[in-house]
Regions:
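Rossmann-like adenosine-cofactor binding region
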Residues: 106-183
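Adenosine-phosphate binding glycine-rich loop
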Residues: 165-166, 171-220
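Glycine-rich phosphate/diphosphate-binding loop of Rossmann-like nucleotide-binding domains
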Residues: 57-130
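Anion-binding alpha/beta catalytic cores of soluble intermediary-metabolism enzymes, centered on
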Residues: 11-85, 170
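Short, acidic/turn-prone active-site loops that include or flank metal/cofactor-
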Residues: 38-43, 98-99, 195-199
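Short, structured coil segments at secondary-structure junctions
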Residues: 29-31, 89, 107-109, 162-164, ...
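Short hydrophobic/aromatic-enriched beta-strand-loop microsegments
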Residues: 33-38, 113, 191-194
Length: 220
């Protein structure tokens, strides 16, 4: 990838890789801009950008907004990128999931940690639901899908019991009927389709800014 890309004068590269830090490693060895499209269970920066944009679009601001990231935190590259960006933009962040799926180091990032779904959604303005990533698990982190659904699956009954409406997000793909029901995903509370649309614009903007920066640097 590095040598061939250099010979073809490719200046911008979008890279998804199963190993954490792969994009940073490549950036140190090629004369090109690397867009990290996800490196293992580490980070997914452009997803965080589109999520932050979608929240601001829905609520008007990020500062002071309470965002709960709920689900499989330990295997999610979306979670860490969201935490880092949202905190930087002034949002309050909570992570919620089974004790086996929430990394113990999360408290060092200045986020709240919760293990009860109802408590999390009563606290937040935005609930970002994450899927269970079976492909990254080498052991069972909970008894069964049915047990996970019962404890952490978001339903309309949960939302109807709230005193105030909240915004529902999901980075996709959705396991409908597991972490979120179809009724919730397709409800007026959901901005999931807006996230998809905003993702195109955000990633176009990233590539545009890289190209403009190169122009300012005399094409390098």
């Amino acid at each position: 990838l590095g040598l061939v890309g250099s010979e073809m004068c490719i200046r911008d590269r979008v890279m998804r890789h199963p190993n954490p830090g792969a994009g940073e490693f490549l950036a140190q060895h090629v004369d090109a801009s690397i867009v990290n499209a996800g490196d293992g269970a580490h980070e997914h920066p452009t997803q965080a950008l589109l999520d932050a944009f979608s929240i601001r679009e829905a609520l008007g601001t990020l500062k002071g907004t309470k965002v709960a990231i709920i689900g499989d935190i330990v295997h999610s590259r979306v979670a860490l990128s969201n935490v880092l960006l949202l905190k930087k933009m002034g949002a309050e962040v909570m992570v919620c999931g089974p004790t086996t799926l929430v990394p113990k180091h999360m408290h060092t990032l200045g986020v709240r940690i919760e293990h009860n779904l109802q408590t999390a959604i009563e606290w937040c303005d935005v609930a970002n639901m994450l899927r269970v990533q079976h492909e990254r698990q080498d052991i069972n982190h909970f008894p069964s899908i049915a047990e996970y659904r019962a404890q952490y699956g978001l339903t309309m009954d949960h939302l109807d019991a709230l005193e105030k409406p909240i915004v529902i997000m999901h980075p996709g793909p959705i396991n409908r009927g597991v972490e979120i029901t179809s009724e919730v995903a397709d409800s007026k509370h959901s901005v999931i389709l807006d996230q998809v649309q905003n993702g195109v614009a955000i990633r176009m903007a990233v590539l545009y800014l890289l190209a403009e920066k190169r122009k300012l640097n005399n094409g390098k």
